[in-house]
């Protein structure tokens, strides 16, 4: 048994000890190094993990079952929405790709030797468009491939309960009808930014500003869409209001929006949102804020942002 300062955890133990947990124990520095260097022995010990980085074992089992009669070696991508699979095919045009439809999933298979896998894997990771482990569990259970499964409490309209809870965290000016739910934070930003870029372009607005340090998925989503339909300008120091103001003076009505975190993760830096709000109002630009680990309840920024994505 390996130990850590937080107690006694084995390598790969889900935290909490539930099949769909997204945190997993790496109790020693050697385990962390093994994970980062993709050591096969370390990775084999991880049944679950943060979905963008670790393929849940149930998703792996589902993929293996779907491809059980297949003779060729491929990389499989299980999309939650057919539209995202179609977007990948349109964007990267992978050679010899195969698509298979299922119940609430779409499988894209690309030959392992294809160089397209690098870009497709990156898109799949940064957009958060894969299926959930619970969908995989449903598939395996219906196929008779699981001896037991997670037991869930029956509720009425679960989505309404979730929206009501989140809206209260935002404060009295936000109601459940103001919320759109996504499968993950990365997927929420991907959906938002893809639509925002198209809308801004129709209005002749092509300049997007990254204000301060942003999460990797946010950066990559901006690069994915804005780089082909506009321009992304970075303001690395979130306290550099002079630079931010000068960009608005230079680009004016061409600015589509400002994307920022409040506070930034992991440095916990906070920009002057009131100043940014004023600049965006002058240019009729969007202000998009991610309250990161602080959450909307504690950040108190909902009234200053056009969109809060979390």
For each feature predicted by the language model, list its residue ranges.
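Conserved N-terminal alpha-helix of the aminotransferase class I/II PLP-enzyme fold
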Residues: 1-191, 195-197, 211-234, 241-243
């Amino acid at each position: 048994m390996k130990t850590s300062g937080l107690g006694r955890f084995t390598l790969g133990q889900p935290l909490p000890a539930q099949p769909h947990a997204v945190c997993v124990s790496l109790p020693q520095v050697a385990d962390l190094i093994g994970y980062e260097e993709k050591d096969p022995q370390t990775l084999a010990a991880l049944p679950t993990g943060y979905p963008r980085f670790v393929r849940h074992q149930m998703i792996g089992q589902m993929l293996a079952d779907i491809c059980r009669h297949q003779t060729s070696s491929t990389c499989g991508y299980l999309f939650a929405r057919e539209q995202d699979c179609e977007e990948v095919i349109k964007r990267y045009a992978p050679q010899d790709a195969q698509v298979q439809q299922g119940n609430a999933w779409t499988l894209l298979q690309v030959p392992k030797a294809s160089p397209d896998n690098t870009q497709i894997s990156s898109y799949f990771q940064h957009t958060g468009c894969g299926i959930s482990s619970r969908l995989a569990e449903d598939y395996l259970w219906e196929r008779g491939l699981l001896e037991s499964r997670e037991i869930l409490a029956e509720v009425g309209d679960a989505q309404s309960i979730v929206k009501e809870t989140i809206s209260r965290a935002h404060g009295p000016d936000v109601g459940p009808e103001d919320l759109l739910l996504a499968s993950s934070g990365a997927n929420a930003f991907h959906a938002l930014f893809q639509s925002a870029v198209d809308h801004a372009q129709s209005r002749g607005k092509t300049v997007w500003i990254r204000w301060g340090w942003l999460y990797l998925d946010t950066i990559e989503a901006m690069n994915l869409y804005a780089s082909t339909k506009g321009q992304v300008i970075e303001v690395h120091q979130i306290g550099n209001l002079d630079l931010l103001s000068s960009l608005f003076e230079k680009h004016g009505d061409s600015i589509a929006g400002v994307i920022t975190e409040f506070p930034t993760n992991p440095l916990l830096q906070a920009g002057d949102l009131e100043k940014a709000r004023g600049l965006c109002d002058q240019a009729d630009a969007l202000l998009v804020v991610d309250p990161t680990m602080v959450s909307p309840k504690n950040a108190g920024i909902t009234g200053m942002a056009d969109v809060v994505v979390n």
